[in-house]
């Protein structure tokens, strides 16, 4: 198989290393204070309102992995693998080989140590590598909460990077290939009007805060953009599954946990970082509550 569309204007795309590390390499110990024990850092899935965050994160991973029709011995690529919970879940419960890509040095070290504890003969690999640099055949692809970084790049092409992404992985998967893409989305103009959404100054200030203090360079796609670039590469969207309402209790649980560990957080990272992250988590909960943002799981098939 060959990779097509992995250049823009004749230049190899570069992963947004500095932008990603500015957030995810804060400190593993800091994130452990407020994420669930699996350290899953994306929207959970509360099948029942009485679920714990850990149970809801398990449900989210299962929801995503079940959509991939995994079979024992397949190779699953996890793009933006975070602290490895999805890879560990896939090895343990689906008996597959896994390759995880991260740009975070802290996540890489955590995942390497985690794999040493996993009792399975399957291949378990984590790399410090961007999707832009990956070029090996795989059977299935999962990406949970990483697509939001795929258009930031290193000053090149913006949303056109999606074209490269979808074409590359279309060509690296078999004829029955499947991809599960879980990403935050924003409404298009028509949906925003239907929802009665406005753009008050407080919203604009919060967006600026997020792009400055939390996720520099991050960009949120519209569903129509995922449709356009994925279909242009040959993918078909088998299912759109919108689960953004679940991010309200997820973010609230994170904020409550961080607040409960305030003294430890300040000892680790200082008062300013604690205040910034509390503002981030509470403010994002409001965005999902008011439907300025959503989460969609796209099941992509060939």
Swiss-Prot record:
Pathway: Lipid metabolism; mycolic acid biosynthesis. Disruption phenotype: Inactivation of cmaA2 causes accumulation of unsaturated derivatives of both the methoxy- and ketomycolates. The mycolic acids of the cmaA2 mutant lack trans-cyclopropane rings but are otherwise intact with respect to cyclopropane and methyl branch content. Deletion of cmaA2 has no effect on bacterial loads during mouse infection but causes hypervirulence due to an excessive immune activation which produces more-severe granulomatous pathology than wild-type, and increases both the macrophage activation and the macrophage inflammatory response. The active site is at 284. Pfam families: CMAS. GO terms for cellular component: cytosol; plasma membrane. One of its GO terms (biological process) is methylation. The keyword Transcription does not apply. Inhibited by S-adenosyl-N-decyl-aminoethyl (SADAE) and thiacetazone (TAC). Keywords: Acetylation, Cytoplasm, Lipid biosynthesis, Lipid metabolism, Methyltransferase, S-adenosyl-L-methionine, Transferase. GO terms for molecular function: cyclopropane-fatty-acyl-phospholipid synthase activity. Disulfide bonds: none annotated. Its EC number is 2.1.1.79. S-adenosyl-L-methionine binds at residues 41-42, 76-84, 102-107, 131-132. Its main location: cytoplasm. It catalyses: a 1-acyl-2-(9Z)-enoyl-sn-glycero-3-phospholipid + S-adenosyl-L-methionine = a 1-acyl-2-(9-cyclopronane)-acyl-sn-glycero-3-phospholipid + S-adenosyl-L-homocysteine + H(+). It is found in: Cytoplasm. Homodimer. Catalyzes the formation of trans cyclopropanated ketomycolate or methoxymycolate through the conversion of a double bond to a cyclopropane ring at the proximal position of an oxygenated mycolic acid via the transfer of a methylene group from S-adenosyl-L-methionine. In the absence of MmaA2, CmaA2 has a non-specific cis-cyclopropanating activity and is able to catalyze the conversion of a double bond to a cis cyclopropane ring at the distal position of an alpha mycolic acid. PANTHER family: CYCLOPROPANE-FATTY-ACYL-PHOSPHOLIPID SYNTHASE. Was identified as a high-confidence drug target. Belongs to the CFA/CMAS family. This is Cyclopropane mycolic acid synthase 2. It comes from Mycobacterium tuberculosis (strain ATCC 25618 / H37Rv). The lineage of its organism: Bacteria, Bacillati, Actinomycetota, Actinomycetes, Mycobacteriales. The gene is cmaA2.
């Amino acid at each position: 198989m060959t990779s097509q569309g992995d250049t823009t204007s004749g230049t190899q795309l570069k992963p947004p290393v500095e932008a990603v590390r500015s957030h995810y390499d804060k400190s593993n110990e800091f994130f452990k204070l407020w994420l669930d024990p699996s350290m899953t850092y994306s929207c959970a899935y509360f099948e029942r309102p009485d679920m714990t965050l850990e149970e809801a994160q398990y449900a989210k991973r299962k929801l995503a992995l079940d959509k991939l029709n995994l079979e024992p011995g397949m190779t699953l690529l996890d793009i933006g693998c975070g602290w490895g919970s999805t890879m560990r879940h896939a090895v343990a419960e689906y008996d597959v080989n896994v390759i995880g890509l991260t740009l975070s040095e802290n996540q890489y070290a955590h995942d390497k140590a985690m794999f040493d504890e996993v009792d399975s003969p399957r291949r378990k690999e984590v790399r410090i590598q961007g999707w832009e640099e990956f070029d090996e055949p795989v059977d299935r692809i999962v990406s949970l909460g990483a697509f939001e970084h795929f258009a930031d790049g290193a000053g090149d092409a913006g949303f056109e990077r999606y074209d490269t992404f979808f074409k590359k992985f279309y060509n690296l998967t078999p004829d029955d290939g499947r991809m599960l893409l879980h990403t935050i989305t924003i409404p298009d103009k028509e949906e925003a009007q239907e929802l009665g959404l406005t753009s008050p100054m407080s919203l604009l200030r919060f967006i600026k805060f997020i792009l400055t203090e939390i996720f520099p360079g991050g960009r949120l796609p519209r569903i129509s953009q995922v449709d356009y670039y994925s279909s242009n590469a040959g993918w078909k969207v088998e299912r759109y599954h919108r689960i953004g309402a679940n991010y309200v209790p997820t973010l609230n649980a994170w904020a409550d946990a961080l607040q409960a560990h305030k003294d430890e957080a300040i000892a680790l990272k200082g008062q300013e970082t604690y205040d910034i992250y509390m503002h981030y988590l509470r403010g994002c909960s409001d965005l999902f509550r008011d439907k300025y943002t959503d989460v969609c799981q796209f099941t992509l098939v060939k």
